[in-house]
Amino acid sequence: MESFQKVEKIGEGTYGVVYKAKNKVTGETVALKKIRLDTETEGVPSTAIREISLLKELNHPNIVKLHDVIHTENKLYLVFEFLHQDLKRFMDSSTVTGISLPLVKSYLFQLLQGLAFCHSHRVLHRDLKPQNLLINAQGEIKLADFGLARAFGVPVRTYTHEVVTLWYRAPEILLGCKYYSTAVDIWSLGCIFAEMITRKALFPGDSEIDQLFRIFRTLGTPDESIWPGVTSMPDYKPSFPKWARQDLSKVVPPLDEDGRDLLGQMLIYDPNKRISAKNALVHRFFRDVTMPVPPLRL
C-alpha cells in the first residue's frame, strides 16, 4: 500500500470505502476499493482471493480494469482504473434535459458488449445498477465490480448499513431461485435502459415483495404458460394477485418500436427465453448506433 497516495474519498460501495488515489511510482490515478470483510478475525478467505485474481484476466474496453489485488493481514484492497463519474450521478444531473437517445443507445450497446464478453467467460455480475456503471468524457461507459458478488456474496446491507437496492434484481432471484444464469444481468440492464429513457426507476421497490408486485403490475403476474416452473419456485405464492400485462408503449412512451421490442426481450420472465447479450447486440435498435460524447460537468 506504500506505493499509493490517497487523494480523496470518492464513495462508499457495497463492500467498503472507495478512494481516488495516485500511484507514487507511475503517477497514474486509480480507484482504490478497500474491501471490509466480516471475517476480520480470520483474515481474507482464500476463495475470495482466488475469485478476485481471476478478474485481472478480464480485459475489455467496457469493463473497469482491475489492475491489482493488495492483500494485507485482514484487509483487501482492489486497485481499479479511475473513471470520473457513475451513471446514477450523470442521470441525476441530466433530469431536466434527459439523456439523448443516441447516447442511451451508445451506452446500452457498450454495456451489452461488456456483458457479452464477461458472460462468454462465464462471469456474472449479479448486482448491476447505475451506481456501478462508470463513464468518462470520451463517451465510454464501463461495468464496475464485475465478479465481486461471487467472491464476497451480495449482502442485504452495505457495511454502512445502507440497504442494497432491489430495483434491478431479476424476478428469478426475488422468487428464491438458487441457481441463476447470465440472464439476471440482462434483466438488470433492461431496467437501467428504461430508466435512462424515462428518467425514473422502472421498478423502485422498497422490499422484496413490493419489488415483485411492481414487476407484476407492469409485466403481468407470471404463470406456467409464460414461465414454465414459476409456480414451483421457493418464494412463489398461489395467492399472488393476478395483474394483467401493461403495454410497453405506456411504460416507456419516448421509446420507438425497435427500442420497445428490445426492452421487451430483456424483460422476459423466463430466463431461458430472455435475450442474451450477444443476440441483443445484433438487434435492429442498434443499426444506427454511434458514440456521442456526453455533456459531462465533471
From Swiss-Prot:
InterPro entries: CDK, Kinase-like_dom_sf, Prot_kinase_dom, Protein_kinase_ATP_BS, Ser/Thr_kinase_AS. One of its GO terms (cellular component) is nucleus. Its EC number is 2.7.11.22. GO terms for molecular function: ATP binding; cyclin binding; cyclin-dependent protein kinase activity; cyclin-dependent protein serine/threonine kinase activity; protein serine kinase activity. The modification Phosphothreonine is found at residues 14, 160. SUPFAM superfamilies: Protein kinase-like (PK-like) (SSF56112). Gene3D superfamilies: Phosphorylase Kinase, domain 1, Transferase(Phosphotransferase) domain 1. The modification Phosphotyrosine is found at residue 15. Belongs to the protein kinase superfamily. CMGC Ser/Thr protein kinase family. CDC2/CDKX subfamily. This is Cyclin-dependent kinase 2. It comes from Carassius auratus.
